[in-house]
Amino acid sequence: MTEQADIIIDNAVVIDGTGAAGRSGGIAVTGDRITAVGDVSAIEAGHRIDAGGHVVAPGFIDCHTHDDRVLLDDPAMACKVTQGVTTVVAGNCGVSLAPFLPSDDWDMPVPMALLGNKKQYKFPSFGAYAKAFEKAPAAVNAAMLCGHNTLRAEAMQGDVKRPATAGEIAQMQRKVRETMEAGAIGVSSGLMYPAGFNAPTSEVAALAEAAGKYGGLYATHLRDEAEKLVQSIE
């Protein structure tokens, strides 16, 4: 019995993501799964695409984006899909769209406007953000970081030109735990920016430790990328 597939992409240079050299061949797709890689000439399909020698590869992961809001506003994500990107990591540089509710009593510190204005920060929890994403799924996968600057701005009510108090750190740690339990992959910081510049290492470490208990990672935009680069890393 002849093997069947929905889509065949043939006459391609196949890069399979294992580190192996590209090889001539193709892939077969059935439903939402790749069901064969390599010689697909004997497989029948309702739709066959001649790649004309172009590369067929796994989707790319864009590991540094600020796509938090774009994922909701433009779920087709043509800006990524047309580049071969199928997964984005957002919430970088200490700025995430959630968990954060702004106040009319204080201004959002720099660089919070990177993701939008006060009206666009409308998710009091990461869980609320995740539900909005699930309601209108984007065309790409998303791995989300919880932003230290976002946490600081809310916990300190915009008064970010100082270290956080023990109580404020405890509030941020609680938010990190809630965010990790709702599906985030870790915490990010943007220590070069006004919102995070005055945070001592101990404050950042406290949040990274909270994420680490869930297997989360820590990503940073360093305090300095020039003369004090080595000091920033240390």
Language-model-detected regions and their locations in the chain:
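Active-site environment of divalent metal-dependent phosphoester hydrolases
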Residues: 68-71, 95-98, 152, 193-196, ...
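Catalytic cores and adjacent flexible loops of soluble metabolic enzymes
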Residues: 70, 125, 146, 222, ...
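Hydrophobic faces of well-ordered beta-strands that scaffold small-molecule active sites
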Residues: 61-65, 88-90, 142-146, 187-189, ...
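Histidine/acidic residue-rich metal-binding segments in metalloenzymes
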Residues: 128-129, 163-189, 195-234
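Histidine-rich, glycine-flanked metal-binding segment
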Residues: 1-8, 14-59
